[in-house]
């Protein structure tokens, strides 16, 4: 059995409740509990591609990855187990979508760590379900209620936008830097002083702001953007479209679905998975970069100054340089060198 999060351990304290139920798991699910869950039926809707990868081999067509849940995925489900995410707006968006499809009378279980803000679930859903706290353990809260009324849901109403110079950035709940350009990305963009061309991969693209701003400066770049978040993927596509920029945007867990090599990889890599601190994605980004860069290709990333990336860069590339820094962030660059010549081979 794989390791379970505290929230899943709380759910298992009530496992007898679910044996005869047709359960839908959704929200910030970060483990394989659905694959080993004892219920009459189990389905999963996830907005995170790496969570889909974790579950798809076992649950096959019963796990769906995407921005919006569909009636087909939710068909026959009589119980929702929702894992509360870090972002309250993301919870509002996802629950409005799910509860607009699930039938009245559906049992709703909301679980999350106390520090995630799960306490606000009662007030958020008050017009549609009367939730009550039924358990508190492992620094988590578990709430239960029954759907009394379906909310109205219009996905288009959740879009927002802001400007970065002449670039319009389209965003959705749960996307990094939803309201404005973050200071780390601003510092990273400041290091691109001259136009350049070639193939560039943006890992963890968020709303597509890096590619869209740099495309204004260097229109000959061939862009590939990737993210694990379905909301980020859709936001990037919308940002690129409104700014008339052509690019490939794909779901990928760092390099899992990336093909080919690039002249440059750029990233403002996350160091959280939900509310948990995690350097896994950044470590995968750095360690795998040389396999996805041409000789002479560069990895350029921005990160909080306290994160231990210099040692990772030196281990992967042999060296690195700091292109810019301020009180909080540093921009690192590492270059793929030519492999040493084999003296046994004839020239």
Curated annotation (Swiss-Prot):
Specifically methylates the guanine in position 1207 of 16S rRNA in the 30S particle. The keyword Cytoplasm applies. It comes from Yersinia pseudotuberculosis serotype IB (strain PB1/+). It catalyses: guanosine(1207) in 16S rRNA + S-adenosyl-L-methionine = N(2)-methylguanosine(1207) in 16S rRNA + S-adenosyl-L-homocysteine + H(+). GO terms for molecular function: 16S rRNA (guanine(1207)-N(2))-methyltransferase activity; nucleic acid binding. This is Ribosomal RNA small subunit methyltransferase C. InterPro entries: DNA_methylase_N6_adenine_CS, Mtase_sm_N, rRNA_ssu_MeTfrase_C, RsmC/RlmG, SAM-dependent_MTases_sf, Small_mtfrase_dom. Monomer. It is an enzyme of class 2 (transferase). It is found in: Cytoplasm. Its EC number is 2.1.1.172. Belongs to the methyltransferase superfamily. RsmC family.
């Amino acid at each position: 059995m794989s390791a379970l999060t505290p929230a899943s351990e709380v759910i298992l304290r009530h496992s007898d409740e679910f044996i005869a139920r047709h359960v839908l798991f959704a929200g910030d699910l970060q483990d394989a509990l659905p694959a080993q869950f004892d219920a009459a039926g189990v389905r999963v809707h996830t907005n995170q591609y790496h969570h889909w990868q974790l579950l798809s081999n076992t649950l096959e067509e019963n796990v769906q990855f995407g921005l919006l849940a569909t009636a087909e995925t939710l068909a026959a489900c009589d119980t929702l187990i929702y894992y509360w995410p870090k972002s309250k707006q993301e919870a509002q968006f996802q629950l409005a979508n799910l509860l607009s499809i699930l039938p009245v009378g559906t049992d709703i279980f909301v679980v999350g760590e106390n520090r995630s803000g799960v306490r606000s679930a009662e007030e958020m859903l008050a017009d549609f379900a009367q939730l009550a706290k039924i358990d508190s353990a492992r620094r988590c809260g578990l709430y239960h209620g029954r759907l009394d009324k379906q909310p109205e849901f219009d996905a288009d109403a959740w879009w927002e936008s802001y400007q970065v110079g002449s670039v319009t950035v389209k965003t959705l709940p749960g996307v990094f830097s939803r309201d404005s350009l973050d200071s780390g990305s601003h510092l990273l963009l400041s290091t691109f002083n001259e136009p350049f061309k070639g193939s560039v991969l943006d890992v963890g693209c968020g709303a597509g702001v890096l590619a869209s701003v740099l495309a204004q400066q260097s229109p000959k770049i061939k862009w590939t953007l990737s993210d694990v978040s379905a909301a980020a993927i859709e936001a990037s596509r919308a940002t690129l479209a409104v700014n008339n920029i052509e690019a490939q945007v794909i779901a990928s867990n760092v390099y899992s679905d990336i093909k080919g090599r690039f002249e440059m990889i750029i990233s403002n890599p996350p160091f959280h998975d939900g509310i948990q601190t995690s350097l896994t994605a950044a470590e995968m980004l750095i360690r795998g970069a040389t396999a996805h860069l041409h000789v002479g290709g560069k990895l350029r990333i921005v990160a909080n100054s306290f994160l231990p990336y210099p040692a990772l860069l030196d281990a992967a590339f042999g060296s690195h340089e700091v292109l810019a820094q301020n009180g909080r962030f540093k921009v690192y660059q590492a270059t793929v060198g030519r492999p040493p010549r084999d003296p046994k081979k004839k020239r």
